[in-house]
Structure formats: C-alpha cells, structure tokens
C-alpha cells in the first residue's frame, strides 16, 4: 500500500516542480541612468506643421517587403528590424558625387481600412559617406504618446523595439523610409503569445490605447498633420534609456542585441498592393463583419471613424466613449529621477519676431532737438548769404587765359577780354 502511495506522491511532486514559477509582481530597484548625450552634434530644426504621407501609396510598381516579428513571452522585448539596403542607396549617392541627402522615417499601424500614424522623423543635409542619420539638421522625433511609453527606435533609427507590448499591439505595422523623395516600404506582422504581461502599458481602468486611425482618403487630402496628431518626445538615446529603465525596474532583462525579423509570405493581395485594404467603403463593410475585424476594433479602442463624411475620426470613435480605452497620461511618467521633464525639453515652433516699438521721447527733449536743428539750418543759411554778398562786391572772377594752338614754331596765348 505504501509503495503505490509514495509513487503517486512522487509523481505529483515532479509535476509541481516542473511547473513554471510565477513571476513576482513587484518592482526592483535599479540605479537611474544619467541623461545621455547625443552621439554627434546636430542642429534641431523645426518645420511648420505639414501632412503625413499616405502609407497606402504602394502598388505593383512599389513592392513591399514583409517581415514576421514574434515575442517568446508576454513580458519580453520585441524587435521590428529589417535592413532596407540603405547602405547601398548611400553608396550610389556617393558615386553620383552627391554632397548630401535628405531622409524621412515614418511608422504606421495598419488597421482594417485605415492607418494610425505612430512615429515621424526628418533628416536634412545628411552625409552619404557616414552611417544613416548622420546629418547637419534633424527635427525632433514625433510619437504617438501611447507607443512612446514602451517603444523606441533602434540605434540606427530604422528599427523599432517594444518592451512588454500589450495584446492590442499585435497586428500589422508599416515603415516608410524616404531618401531624396524615393520611398521604400517594409511591413511587419507582429504576433504575441497567449497571456498578458502584468506591467504592460495597458490598464482598462486608466485606458491606455493608440490614437486616431485615418482612412486613405484623409491622407490623400492632407488632413493628417504631424504636429496635430503626434507629440514631440526625447531623442533616441534618452528614449532608449528611459524605456530600458522602466523595463528593468519591473524585472525585465534587456537583450544585448536583437536579431533581424524573419521573412514572411503574406497571402496574395487582389491588386498586388498592400495586404491591408486602402480603406474603401465596400472593403470596410465586408471586413467589418469578420471575426478578425471585430477583434481589432475591440483591442484598439473602437472602430475607425466614418468615411462617408470625409471628416477625421472623432474621439468617441477612437476610444473616447464611456467604458472604452482612452489616451493615457504623459509617456514620460516613468522618467528616471533627475531627468528633465518632457515639457522642459519640448518647445513650439518659434514665432516670427516682431520689431519692437521705439521708446517714446520726452516732450522737453524733443523740443530741444527741434530747436537745435532750426539753429543749425539758420547758421548754414547765414553763412551762404555772407559768401554770396562778398562775391557780388568783388566783381566777376578773372578768366584764365585760353591756350591757342601754335602757329608755326611760335606759341602764344590770347589776351584776356
């Protein structure tokens, strides 16, 4: 009797030992990092607000590379990395003897019939003989405030790192890289494992979620403005430090490096374009009833705004309704102690300088200046009159003898008179 009982107890003990130990839901102390310096010197240049280009401009003549990014565990980091062959592009610029190039990097989240702008960065007067982004001028990085709380660009500023992303982050992302007006698209299909990370930047009570989603027509009509729907954030060096610090305080381990995302073969699109429909009404009606479309709307703060009226999605349509997720607090809430706040490093575009009004002159001083001017004019007039009268009394000035041409070998002058 004892033998079978001990065997059963041993089997139960073995099963218990093999079960994963639940991670403690506590934060740990991590030395706050110092505010990092930029990798090189550059001038931060603001631009007047302008439209964000449409992510739906691809087609047969503009192929899209598709990658697959997956996370091993709910509380891990996730990397969206794909080489856009930018080194080859810069080498071709060197061969053309180009002295500089301009570039823009934009990230979107592609939904059913619409796209959410997530990140926008411009580079001007860049050196083609150096690595990408080594430029004389740069704009501040503009972010979706929710994504900025747990994601940051890679060191080359072409990839994207996410720390413990929540379930609603799953889906399709598109990176648009513009170099001197030529665009290269890369799509990333993000997959997350089952379960939720306890410290992900998502809380139903506080309502963290993405911002508005815009159909293709609103991008084409230049209604999606970068300074209206995106927020200025820390530079890449500081952004990486603040997210890594938050991640490590919750027990996370930052990998020493991230591998490139694997290739992915998407299902063939009907028109050879993007795997996501560009937002026409028929596609929205057909896909709005599917299970995936319903899940996407629930996980991303409500359905996109109506397309029939051509207006931007309303706050209620993007998470503003009661009981639905709403935009969260400022993404710099987890900044290390002693760091400047987000408000301290951000500034609006400088207003045009207005000339200052001249200071008022006292009445007494003005009268004195006028009297002195009148006296000077009177003295000058008196001097001119004195010289004129002297010349009249002396008679006309003697005329200089006129030189006449020689006659033979004799030179002579005409007599005065």
Swiss-Prot record:
<keyword id="KW-1161">Viral attachment to host cell</keyword>
<feature type="disulfide bond">
    <location>
        <begin position="75"/>
        <end position="197"/>
    </location>
</feature>
<dbReference type="GO" id="GO:0046718">
    <property type="term" value="P:symbiont entry into host cell"/>
</dbReference>
<feature type="disulfide bond">
    <location>
        <begin position="114"/>
        <end position="213"/>
    </location>
</feature>
<feature type="disulfide bond">
    <location>
        <begin position="126"/>
        <end position="135"/>
    </location>
</feature>
<keyword id="KW-0946">Virion</keyword>
<keyword id="KW-0325">Glycoprotein</keyword>
<dbReference type="InterPro" id="IPR002896">
    <property type="entry name" value="Herpes_glycop_dom"/>
</dbReference>
<keyword id="KW-1234">Viral attachment to host entry receptor</keyword>
<keyword id="KW-0261">Viral envelope protein</keyword>
<feature type="glycosylation site" description="N-linked (GlcNAc...) asparagine; by host">
    <location>
        <position position="102"/>
    </location>
</feature>
<dbReference type="GO" id="GO:0055036">
    <property type="term" value="C:virion membrane"/>
</dbReference>
<feature type="glycosylation site" description="N-linked (GlcNAc...) asparagine; by host">
    <location>
        <position position="41"/>
    </location>
</feature>
<feature type="topological domain" description="Intravirion">
    <location>
        <begin position="390"/>
        <end position="417"/>
    </location>
</feature>
<dbReference type="GO" id="GO:0098670">
    <property type="term" value="P:entry receptor-mediated virion attachment to host cell"/>
</dbReference>
<keyword id="KW-1015">Disulfide bond</keyword>
<keyword id="KW-0812">Transmembrane</keyword>
<feature type="topological domain" description="Virion surface">
    <location>
        <begin position="19"/>
        <end position="360"/>
    </location>
</feature>
<feature type="signal peptide">
    <location>
        <begin position="1"/>
        <end position="18"/>
    </location>
</feature>
<feature type="compositionally biased region" description="Acidic residues">
    <location>
        <begin position="279"/>
        <end position="292"/>
    </location>
</feature>
<feature type="transmembrane region" description="Helical">
    <location>
        <begin position="361"/>
        <end position="389"/>
    </location>
</feature>
<feature type="region of interest" description="Disordered">
    <location>
        <begin position="259"/>
        <end position="355"/>
    </location>
</feature>
<dbReference type="InterPro" id="IPR036179">
    <property type="entry name" value="Ig-like_dom_sf"/>
</dbReference>
<keyword id="KW-1160">Virus entry into host cell</keyword>
<keyword id="KW-1133">Transmembrane helix</keyword>
<comment type="function">
    <text>Envelope glycoprotein that binds to host cell entry receptors, promoting the virus entry into host cells. May trigger fusion with host membrane, by recruiting the fusion machinery composed of gB and gH/gL.</text>
</comment>
<protein>
    <recommendedName>
        <fullName>Envelope glycoprotein D</fullName>
    </recommendedName>
</protein>
<keyword id="KW-0732">Signal</keyword>
<dbReference type="Pfam" id="PF01537">
    <property type="entry name" value="Herpes_glycop_D"/>
</dbReference>
<comment type="similarity">
    <text>Belongs to the herpesviridae glycoprotein D family.</text>
</comment>
<keyword id="KW-0945">Host-virus interaction</keyword>
<keyword id="KW-0472">Membrane</keyword>
<dbReference type="GO" id="GO:0019031">
    <property type="term" value="C:viral envelope"/>
</dbReference>
<dbReference type="GO" id="GO:0016020">
    <property type="term" value="C:membrane"/>
</dbReference>
């Amino acid at each position: 009797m004892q033998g079978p009982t001990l065997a059963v107890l041993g089997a139960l003990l073995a099963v218990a030992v093999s079960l994963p130990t639940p991670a403690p839901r506590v934060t740990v102390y991590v030395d706050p990092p110092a505010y990092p310096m930029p990798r090189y010197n550059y001038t931060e240049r603001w631009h007047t607000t302008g439209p964000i280009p449409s992510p739906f401009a691809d087609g047969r003549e503009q192929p899209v590379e598709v990658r697959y990014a997956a996370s091993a565990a709910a509380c891990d980091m996730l990397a969206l990395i794909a080489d856009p062959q930018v080194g080859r592009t810069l080498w071709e610029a060197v061969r053309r003897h180009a002295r500089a190039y301009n570039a823009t990097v934009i990230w979107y989240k592609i939904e059913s019939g619409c796209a959410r702008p997530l990140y926008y960065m411009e580079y001007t007067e860049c050196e083609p003989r150096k690595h990408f982004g080594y430029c004389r001028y740069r704009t501040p990085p503009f972010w979706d405030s929710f994504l900025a709380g747990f994601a940051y660009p890679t060191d080359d500023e072409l990839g994207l790192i996410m720390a413990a992303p929540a379930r609603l982050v799953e889906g399709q992302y598109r990176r648009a890289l513009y170099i001197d007006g030529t665009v290269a698209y890369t799509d990333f299909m993000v997959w997350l494992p089952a379960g939720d990370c306890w410290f992900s930047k998502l809380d139903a009570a506080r309502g963290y979620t993405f911002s508005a989603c815009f159909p293709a027509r609103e991008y084409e009509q230049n209604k999606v403005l970068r300074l209206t729907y995106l927020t200025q954030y820390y530079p890449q060096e500081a952004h990486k430090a603040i997210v890594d610090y938050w991640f490590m305080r919750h027990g996370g381990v930052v990998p020493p490096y991230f591998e490139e995302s694997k290739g992915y073969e998407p299902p063939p699109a009907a028109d050879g374009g993007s795997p996501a429909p560009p937002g026409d009404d028929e596609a929205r009606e057909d896909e709005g009833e599917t299970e995936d479309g319903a899940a996407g709307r629930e996980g991303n703060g409500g359905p996109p705004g109506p397309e029939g009226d051509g207006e931007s999605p309303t706050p209620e349509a993007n998470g503003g309704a009661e009981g639905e997720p709403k935009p969260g607090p400022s993404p710099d809430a987890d900044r290390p102690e002693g760091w400047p706040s987000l408000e301290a490093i951000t500034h609006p575009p400088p207003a045009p300088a207005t000339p200052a009004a001249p200071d008022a002159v006292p009445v007494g001083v003005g009268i004195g200046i006028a009297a002195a001017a009148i006296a000077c004019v009177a003295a000058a007039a008196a001097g001119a009159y004195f010289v004129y009268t002297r010349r009249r009394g002396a008679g006309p000035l003697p005329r200089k003898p006129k030189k006449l041409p020689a006659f033979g070998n004799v030179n002579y002058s005409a007599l005065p008179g």
